[in-house]
Design a protein with these regions (language model features):
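Short glycine/proline- and charge-enriched loop/turn segments
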Residues: 59-66, 198-207, 246-253
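Hydrophobic anchor at the start of a short beta-strand
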Residues: 120, 228-229
């Protein structure tokens, strides 16, 4: 398979990743591009398979749960703070229309919806009941007519770009964005300390759901050919992903005992904040000229 970012056909390495969170027996192959270091799943997932993987009955971001919901809400306030500081602060409009694509239960939207300045929309393949100041629309993210009708000032792609099978589908959304609007992308960083430490148990793989995984350099390269946009990147911290990685590590240890895994399990509680300085999420802002 060709790298979607640089079109290189050569790879540094290929490896198998378990589906630690949902089906331990399932494995998917990933490769690292020899040219740009993009990590990508080597096979595609069709729509039928995707509907099963992201079903509201099983998939945590839409199914939720008491602990999961509260952790995600807490993280959403941290994300909102950074988005207001880096993007929304420059918007002097009385009303700002926000569209969150593949929004799940709408944790981040809910943080904005408390303020009447923001008019909030969420798009997801699962049905999500409307909440105060949030209109949820059950549709695929490829439904360009819906996106065009909403005509958002801010489009949020929060932990979703890595799920997209064909990056051209995201380019199509950028093409219909209005002048002066922004697309905000939040995604795992393959250069994080957590990936180096947890290895194949790193939650950023989220196999087989994650298709493409970026670092700051290759995500800029992915969008650099689009002339009518300005690109900026920075970093965010998400401590809860390291908790998932720790859980994955324990699951792996139960079936594949090794001293190395045992030592990692012992010292991980001391290192859960290992990405506090380096941070483990990429925040990209795409401004339409």
């Amino acid at each position: 398979m060709v790298c979607q970012t640089c079109k290189c056909e050569n790879t540094k390495s290929s490896f198998l990743i378990r589906d630690y969170e949902y089906d331990f027996s399932s494995v998917s192959e990933y490769s690292i591009c020899k040219s740009c270091n993009l990590i990508y799943r080597t096979h595609n997932i069709n729509d039928e398979k995707a509907n099963l993987l992201y079903s509201k009955k099983v998939y945590k971001p839409v199914k939720g749960g008491f602990l999961y919901d509260n952790l995600k809400k807490l993280n959403a306030y941290y994300e909102k703070y950074h988005l207001i500081r880096k993007v929304f602060k420059s918007k002097d409009k009385k009303k700002i229309v926000i569209l969150d694509i593949a929004c799940g239960k709408g944790y981040l939207l809910e943080a904005f919806a408390k303020y009447k300045k923001y008019i909030c929309f969420g798009v997801d393949i699962n049905y999500i009941p409307d909440r105060e100041n949030i209109k949820f629309i059950k549709t695929d993210f490829k439904n360009l007519n819906i996106i065009k009708d909403i005509n958002a000032d801010i489009i949020i792609i929060n932990n979703f770009i890595e799920h997209i099978e064909d990056i051209n589908d995201l380019y199509k959304i950028i093409n219909i964005m209005k002048q002066g609007s922004n697309m905000i992308i939040i995604t795992p960083d393959t250069d994080s300390n957590a990936r180096l430490f947890f290895g194949f148990c790193w939650s950023g793989y989220h196999a087989p759901r994650h298709k493409i995984l970026f670092n700051k350099n290759n995500i800029l390269k992915t969008f650099s050919h689009i002339k009518e946009v300005n690109l900026k990147t920075s970093k965010l911290y998400d401590p809860f992903t390291n908790l998932i990685s720790y859980s994955n590590l324990i699951k792996e240890f139960r079936v594949n005992f090794s001293i190395k895994l045992l030592l990692k399990i012992i010292i991980t509680p001391l290192l859960l904040l290992m990405d506090l300085l380096n941070k483990n999420r990429i925040l990209m802002i795409i401004e339409k000229k």
